Structures are given as structure tokens and as C-alpha cells.
Amino acid sequence: MEPAREPPARARPPPPAARPAPAAPRPRSPAEAEARGPEGLLRRSGSGYEGSTSWKAALEDTTTRLLLGAIAVLLFAILVVMSILASKGCIKCETPCPEDWLLYGRKCYYFSEEPRDWNTGRQYCHTHEAALAVIQSQKELEFMFKFTRREPWIGLRRVGDDFHWVNGDPFDPDTFTISGMGECVFVEPTRLVSTECLTTRPWVCSKMAYT
């Protein structure tokens, strides 16, 4: 009787091949790094990074244009106002007094050359937005004395028994004294004198200086 045969030995499977080690990552170029960075992601994702920048630039440009437009409108309005003022004669405000007028204190004075009666002199002053001179202080009177070579009319006249200035103020006899018995007053080099209003002589206008 033949002996029992042993079953053949099973062949062992070959061991699995070793996996190759992963390759080292390739260094990124600056362009790739920028593309993978936050700004690149924003550009790729369409979140509007570049759009946001251009939007801000557009907004700033619009704001600048609006500001320049407002400045242009303001300058135009100023020119219009200046033109209106100039047409009304306010261009004279550039100097304290009109031409041929003399500045003293806060007043402008006009000393006429031609002789006229008191009322004519008063009317002349009125047409030049002034009045026959009203003297309000001793210093003003002393200033007037310096320009009285031709003894001009001033804005002082008798009303009844008392003298009054043309602006309605009463005359103060304690401040000034008046010689003569006439109705209208003129200035001599050292005093005030009253005489007939129809007498012809130069006159002095006064008004407030431009400020």
C-alpha cells in the first residue's frame, strides 16, 4: 500500500512592492504664489477685489468732479454778485472816500470851489449821498478851520430862535459859539458865523467813509 502523499506546499505571494516616496513639492514661482494668495483667490473667485479697487477709484473721481463743479458754481455766483454791486456804484467801496474827497477820522469831506447859496450847496451834497458838514466835536471843528480859506457853508441853520444841524441834532452852544444874526452858518478861520442864506460862498459836504 502506497504511503499517503503530502499536499504540495502553497507558494507564498511575493511581498508587495515598496511604494515610491512622494516627490518633494516643487517650489512655487512668485506668480503662482501671488495667484494662490488671498488677493489671487479674490481675483479668481470673482469677489471683486480688482472691481472694488476700480469702484473706489471711480467713486473718488466722481467726488472730485462734484467738488470741482461746486467750486465753479460758487465762483460764478461771486462774480455775479460783484457785477451787481459794481453796477450799483459800490465799486467805490474799494477806497474810503470818493475821488476829490478828503478823509478825516471816519468821515469824508468835499470842499467845493465855486460859490453858491446855502440851499444850492445843500442840494449838491444830497445828490452825492452826503450832507452839508455836521461838526460833532471840537477836533472836527479845528480840522475844518484848516480848510476855511474861502469860508464855506456848513450844515447849520437857525430854526426859530435856535440853531439846528441838517441831520436834526440841536446845536450845543456850550461846544461852539456863533457870531452874526443870519440864518445860515459858515466857517471862518477861527469861528462860526451866521449870515443870510442867499449869500453865495463855497460849501463843505460830509458823509461817513466806506468801510
UniProtKB/Swiss-Prot annotation:
The modification Phosphoserine is found at residue 29. Coiled coil: none annotated. The keyword ATP-binding does not apply. PROSITE patterns: C_TYPE_LECTIN_1, C_TYPE_LECTIN_2. CDD domains: CLECT_NK_receptors_like. Residues 104-206 form the C-type lectin domain. Disulfide bonds join 125-205, 184-197. This is C-type lectin domain family 2 member L. It comes from Mus musculus (Mouse). The gene is Clec2l.
